[in-house]
């Protein structure tokens, strides 16, 4: 099916929002211009809504295989499509871990059969993510590994991390890291700060993250490897990443929507839906994340979509697993709380969620360019809705944002020229 999207707006090559039509033919973007006509295409009236590149998320947890009670490839990718994401990169903390040919082939088969959006799987750095034996990077790359990570845990052994970085560099691949120094975690469930002190909880200190990043940056410099830092959350982390970039070290970084919108002061009670890793930090950390995003220290926004069951989250803040869902709330949360408040521009938000992650990892995504695959999301910037977890397509309803009123909701998502999700009665 060919589609002609009429009377929309998009961000052009100069980074400006302008009026446009967009023609999709044979799964590709055929033309982006005003006043397009086409005889062989279904016309979809966009009514002034934003036509954006499909959003790109380099940090997601789909849970399958092994955690299908939390999420499946089918439910997770439907939720991604509803959130406007067309390319997502799935973390390897599944059971089994994609750490060998057999496991990666099985994962790719599942993705091919079930995914509603483009899914690029990470390969594990170590076997079973246990930190003691390196995986076969060459085989995992051959089978389509997006990059290498042991996300969910930090690689504690510096010699293992250095060897992994050297091997990845030879393959022109990135090493992506969840950064925690295990000896400093302190059995914490929240940030070590005012909230932990008030409620008598063990806290995770900020330096637990930043010291690990500092170590890895020096290892990346020695290995000449592209090193990407997951979910940056502290002022100290921003500082060491900024210094590394100024020194010419190949380091990039991401931040989550929840760390951009919330800090520990916003946690209303010992609610496990506010428990994530890294935890919500202090006000100064939150300000540093915004500053780092604006000055280029932090390159992109990624959701760290981490679904869990209601039963798991009901165990209380100390026992409940870390993580919140992110796909279906990311864009409206960021648009309402950053763009509408004048902290960043709409153009910047689009870039942080599309071209910046795509360019960082060399993906042919993130831009509406003629000849490229038609991965598109259409967003109604005026639509206001209350976040209601009962309407999530994700199995995970674990969000701290229930009841928040937000503007800027995706109404249609196109993947490979086909409609992957559409809000009922969204377009005429």
Swiss-Prot record:
Active site (catalytic residues): 304
Record keywords, A-Z: Hydrolase, Metal-binding, Pyrimidine biosynthesis, Zinc
Cofactor, free-text remark: Binds 2 Zn(2+) ions per subunit.
Pfam families to which the protein is assigned, alphabetical: Amidohydro_1
Stored CDD domains: DHOase_IIa
PROSITE patterns: DIHYDROOROTASE_1, DIHYDROOROTASE_2
Residues at which Zn(2+) 2 binds: 151, 178, 231
Co-factor(s): Zn(2+)
SUPFAM superfamilies: Composite domain of metallo-dependent hydrolases, Metallo-dependent hydrolases
Residue positions binding Zn(2+) 1: 59, 61, 151, 304
Keyword Zinc: yes
EC code(s) of this entry: 3.5.2.3
Cysteine disulfide partners in this protein: none
Keyword Hydrolase assigned: yes
Positions with a binding annotation for substrate: 61-63, 93, 277, 308, 322-323
Pathway annotation: Pyrimidine metabolism; UMP biosynthesis via de novo pathway; (S)-dihydroorotate from bicarbonate: step 3/3
Any one Gene Ontology cellular component term annotated for this protein: cytoplasm
HAMAP family in the record: PyrC_classI_B (MF_00220_B)
Function: Catalyzes the reversible cyclization of carbamoyl aspartate to dihydroorotate.
Family: Belongs to the metallo-dependent hydrolases superfamily. DHOase family. Class I DHOase subfamily.
UniProt-listed NCBIfam families: PRK09357.1-2, pyrC_multi
PANTHER family: ALLANTOINASE
Listed name of the protein: Dihydroorotase
